[in-house]
A protein has these predicted regions:
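Short C-terminal tail/terminal secondary-structure segment
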Residues: 63, 74-90
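A conserved structural motif in NAD(P)-dependent oxidoreductases
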Residues: 34-35, 47-58, 69
Length: 90
């Protein structure tokens, strides 16, 4: 971000929390698709919003970062994690 800012390039990131995907579904959810596994329950217990993320949850942060409202924002990471960062993690 510091090297590209003089060129007018903003460098930011979104740090998603726990989202259920094909890659991690077996770790977070039982085969019924509704019941969290022991690990999934541990993650949810450390997530103040007590749910996994949905793809649409990322849209607000993304829309902000690409909007004129973020024209003076660079070098930042926006967590979209249901408050997970507020805890020490798993």
């Amino acid at each position: 971000a510091t090297h590209l800012a003089p060129l007018g390039v903003r460098v930011n990131a979104i740090a998603p929390g726990f989202f259920i995907t094909d890659q991690n579904r077996f770790l977070m959810m039982e085969k019924d698709g509704e019941t969290p596994t022991p690990r999934g329950r541990k993650v949810l217990a450390k997530t103040p919003m007590h749910r996994f993320g949905e793809p649409g949850d990322l849209c607000g942060a993304l829309q902000f970062l690409v909007s004129p409202s973020a024209s003076f924002v660079t070098g930042t990471i926006i967590p979209v994690d249901g408050g997970f960062l507020a805890y020490s993690g798993v």
